[in-house]
Amino acid sequence: MINEIKSDAQTRMDKCVESTKTQMAKVRTGRAHPSLLDTIQVPYYGSLTPLKQVASVSIGDARTLTVSVFDRTMIAAVEKAIMSSDLGLNPMSAGATIRIPLPALTEERRKDLIKVVRAEAENGRIAIRNVRRDANSNVKELEKEKECTEDDVRRSEDDVQKLTDAHIKLVDDVLAAKEKELMEF
């Protein structure tokens, strides 16, 4: 039973780390990256559709994204969706493709983005600690129900703490890499 609680905690902590990585990937750096446009929804036949379902996104060069729309009638809608996103991008259409130059980040904007990234990392750490708290309380419930000994509880808490420390270190490593990426250029 304790092993099930520990493996559940491991799985949930892994998900917390992945979620933190995903949230940090959404933060724009100075480099062009196709995942930058993953959150954009385009109106298509009356419903909002993810951009990657109506177009392919590729890297033109280090500071330019190229969007190739599958249906030429969608070019204006895709362009409007990119403009209205909160990414601060200014697309230019050229025939069947849309070029999106990425403006250089100012020092002030970099510092703001670093604050955002640090907040995301802290949210990840908090989520991991909440998983630890849940796992420890589940083990204490087992002790109250006399399904395990006090030594088992202590051992389990130590194991869960080691898991927590390892996962928080992963979040810190992701944060350090993202901060380094933001301060380049």
From Swiss-Prot:
Location of the protein in the cell: Cytoplasm
Gene Ontology cellular component annotations, sorted alphabetically: cytosol
Annotated keywords: Cytoplasm, Protein biosynthesis
Gene Ontology biological-process annotations: cytoplasmic translational termination
GO molecular function, one term: ribosomal large subunit binding
NCBIfam families: frr (TIGR00496)
UniProt record similarity statement: Belongs to the RRF family.
Name the record gives this protein: Ribosome-recycling factor
